Protein backbone atom coordinates (compact mmCIF):
# COMPACT_ATOMS: atom_id res chain seq x y z
CA UNK A 1 0.00 0.00 0.00
CA UNK A 2 1.24 3.47 -0.90
CA UNK A 3 0.36 6.81 0.62
CA UNK A 4 -0.65 9.28 -2.09
CA UNK A 5 -1.00 13.03 -1.63
CA UNK A 6 -3.48 14.02 -4.34
CA UNK A 7 -3.71 17.77 -5.02
CA UNK A 8 -6.56 18.26 -7.47
CA UNK A 9 -10.07 19.52 -8.06
CA UNK A 10 -13.33 18.36 -6.54
CA UNK A 11 -16.61 18.49 -8.46
CA UNK A 12 -20.14 17.69 -7.32
CA UNK A 13 -21.43 16.68 -10.76
CA UNK A 14 -19.19 14.36 -12.74
CA UNK A 15 -15.95 12.56 -12.12
CA UNK A 16 -12.70 14.47 -12.59
CA UNK A 17 -9.76 15.32 -10.35
CA UNK A 18 -9.98 13.98 -6.82
CA UNK A 19 -13.63 13.15 -7.50
CA UNK A 20 -12.34 10.55 -9.96
CA UNK A 21 -8.97 9.59 -8.45
CA UNK A 22 -9.52 8.96 -4.76
CA UNK A 23 -12.00 6.06 -4.79
CA UNK A 24 -10.29 3.92 -7.47
CA UNK A 25 -6.89 4.37 -5.83
CA UNK A 26 -8.38 3.40 -2.48
CA UNK A 27 -10.07 0.36 -4.03
CA UNK A 28 -6.71 -0.97 -5.19
CA UNK A 29 -5.26 -0.58 -1.72
CA UNK A 30 -3.68 2.87 -1.58
CA UNK A 31 -4.17 5.42 1.17
CA UNK A 32 -5.12 8.68 -0.57
CA UNK A 33 -4.93 12.07 1.10
CA UNK A 34 -6.93 14.49 -1.09
CA UNK A 35 -6.21 18.21 -1.02
CA UNK A 36 -8.59 20.26 -3.12
CA UNK A 37 -7.65 23.09 -5.49
CA UNK A 38 -11.26 23.96 -6.32
CA UNK A 39 -14.73 22.89 -5.21
CA UNK A 40 -16.82 23.30 -8.36
CA UNK A 41 -20.31 22.27 -9.34
CA UNK A 42 -18.93 20.51 -12.44
CA UNK A 43 -15.98 20.25 -14.83
CA UNK A 44 -15.04 23.57 -16.45
CA UNK A 45 -15.28 21.94 -19.86
CA UNK A 46 -19.07 22.43 -19.63
CA UNK A 47 -18.46 26.16 -20.08
CA UNK A 48 -20.31 27.24 -16.93
CA UNK A 49 -19.75 26.18 -13.37
CA UNK A 50 -20.14 27.53 -9.87
CA UNK A 51 -18.10 27.18 -6.72
CA UNK A 52 -14.86 28.48 -5.30
CA UNK A 53 -11.25 28.15 -6.26
CA UNK A 54 -9.40 27.29 -3.09
CA UNK A 55 -6.86 30.04 -2.34
CA UNK A 56 -3.25 28.90 -2.65
CA UNK A 57 -2.63 30.00 0.94
CA UNK A 58 -5.38 27.61 2.12
CA UNK A 59 -3.92 24.73 0.10
CA UNK A 60 -0.47 25.50 1.54
CA UNK A 61 -1.92 25.62 5.07
CA UNK A 62 -3.52 22.20 4.63
CA UNK A 63 -0.23 20.73 3.43
CA UNK A 64 1.58 22.45 6.32
CA UNK A 65 -0.88 20.91 8.76
CA UNK A 66 -0.28 17.50 7.24
CA UNK A 67 3.47 18.04 7.61
CA UNK A 68 3.00 18.99 11.26
CA UNK A 69 1.32 15.58 11.77
CA UNK A 70 4.34 13.84 10.16
CA UNK A 71 2.35 12.85 7.08
CA UNK A 72 4.66 14.23 4.39
CA UNK A 73 7.50 11.91 5.33
CA UNK A 74 5.11 9.00 4.72
CA UNK A 75 4.05 10.13 1.23
CA UNK A 76 5.11 7.71 -1.50
CA UNK A 77 3.61 9.67 -4.39
CA UNK A 78 2.26 13.13 -5.09
CA UNK A 79 -0.44 13.38 -7.74
CA UNK A 80 -1.60 16.71 -9.12
CA UNK A 81 -4.24 17.65 -11.64
CA UNK A 82 -6.47 20.68 -12.17
CA UNK A 83 -4.71 23.70 -10.72
CA UNK A 84 -7.54 26.20 -10.36
CA UNK A 85 -5.67 29.45 -9.71
CA UNK A 86 -2.28 30.19 -11.17
CA UNK A 87 -0.80 30.59 -7.68
CA UNK A 88 -1.42 26.89 -6.95
CA UNK A 89 1.57 25.92 -9.13
CA UNK A 90 4.03 27.22 -6.54
CA UNK A 91 2.22 25.36 -3.76
CA UNK A 92 2.33 22.09 -5.69
CA UNK A 93 6.00 22.39 -6.63
CA UNK A 94 6.82 23.32 -3.02
CA UNK A 95 4.83 20.34 -1.69
CA UNK A 96 6.69 18.02 -4.06
CA UNK A 97 10.03 19.42 -2.88
CA UNK A 98 9.02 18.97 0.77
CA UNK A 99 7.89 15.40 0.19
CA UNK A 100 11.04 14.47 -1.74
CA UNK A 101 13.25 16.05 0.94
CA UNK A 102 11.60 13.78 3.51
CA UNK A 103 11.29 10.73 1.24
CA UNK A 104 13.76 10.71 -1.68
CA UNK A 105 12.01 7.65 -3.12
CA UNK A 106 8.70 9.47 -3.52
CA UNK A 107 7.53 10.19 -7.05
CA UNK A 108 5.53 13.05 -8.49
CA UNK A 109 2.91 12.33 -11.16
CA UNK A 110 1.45 15.40 -12.87
CA UNK A 111 -1.70 15.41 -14.95
CA UNK A 112 -1.19 18.74 -16.75
CA UNK A 113 -4.89 19.56 -17.07
CA UNK A 114 -5.49 22.24 -19.70
CA UNK A 115 -8.25 21.05 -22.00
CA UNK A 116 -8.80 18.63 -24.84
CA UNK A 117 -8.74 18.46 -28.62
CA UNK A 118 -12.52 18.67 -28.91
CA UNK A 119 -13.24 21.70 -26.71
CA UNK A 120 -9.83 23.36 -26.55
CA UNK A 121 -8.36 25.01 -23.49
CA UNK A 122 -10.63 25.26 -20.44
CA UNK A 123 -8.25 26.76 -17.90
CA UNK A 124 -7.17 30.37 -17.46
CA UNK A 125 -4.58 31.63 -19.93
CA UNK A 126 -1.92 31.73 -17.20
CA UNK A 127 -2.12 28.02 -16.39
CA UNK A 128 -0.64 26.34 -19.53
CA UNK A 129 2.69 28.22 -19.41
CA UNK A 130 2.95 27.60 -15.66
CA UNK A 131 2.39 23.90 -16.22
CA UNK A 132 4.92 23.77 -19.06
CA UNK A 133 7.61 25.90 -17.44
CA UNK A 134 7.28 25.18 -13.71
CA UNK A 135 5.12 22.20 -12.79
CA UNK A 136 5.94 19.63 -15.50
CA UNK A 137 9.73 20.02 -15.04
CA UNK A 138 9.29 19.00 -11.39
CA UNK A 139 7.41 15.82 -12.35
CA UNK A 140 8.75 12.29 -12.60
CA UNK A 141 5.75 11.27 -14.68
CA UNK A 142 3.25 13.26 -16.71
CA UNK A 143 -0.07 12.09 -18.14
CA UNK A 144 -1.08 14.61 -20.81
CA UNK A 145 -3.84 13.97 -23.29
CA UNK A 146 -3.31 14.68 -27.00
CA UNK A 147 -4.15 18.39 -26.69
CA UNK A 148 -1.93 18.87 -23.64
CA UNK A 149 0.98 16.95 -25.17
CA UNK A 150 0.82 19.18 -28.22
CA UNK A 151 0.97 22.31 -26.08
CA UNK A 152 3.76 21.03 -23.85
CA UNK A 153 5.95 19.96 -26.76
CA UNK A 154 4.90 22.70 -29.20
CA UNK A 155 4.12 20.01 -31.77
CA UNK A 156 1.11 19.07 -33.82
CA UNK A 157 0.09 15.73 -32.30
CA UNK A 158 -2.34 14.08 -34.72
CA UNK A 159 -1.38 10.42 -35.06
CA UNK A 160 0.81 7.71 -33.57
CA UNK A 161 3.98 8.86 -35.34
CA UNK A 162 3.59 12.48 -34.23
CA UNK A 163 2.73 11.34 -30.70
CA UNK A 164 5.85 9.18 -30.51
CA UNK A 165 7.95 12.05 -31.86
CA UNK A 166 6.48 14.38 -29.22
CA UNK A 167 7.34 12.07 -26.34
CA UNK A 168 10.81 11.21 -27.62
Language-model segments: which ranges?
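Conserved phosphate/ATP/ADP-binding segment of small-molecule kinases
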Residues: 123-168
Amino acid sequence: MSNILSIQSAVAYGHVGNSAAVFPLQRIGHEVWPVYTVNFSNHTGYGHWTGPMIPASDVADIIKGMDERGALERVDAVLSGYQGGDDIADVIVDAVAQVKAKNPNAIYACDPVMGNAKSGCHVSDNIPPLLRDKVVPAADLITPNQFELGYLTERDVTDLDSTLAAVD
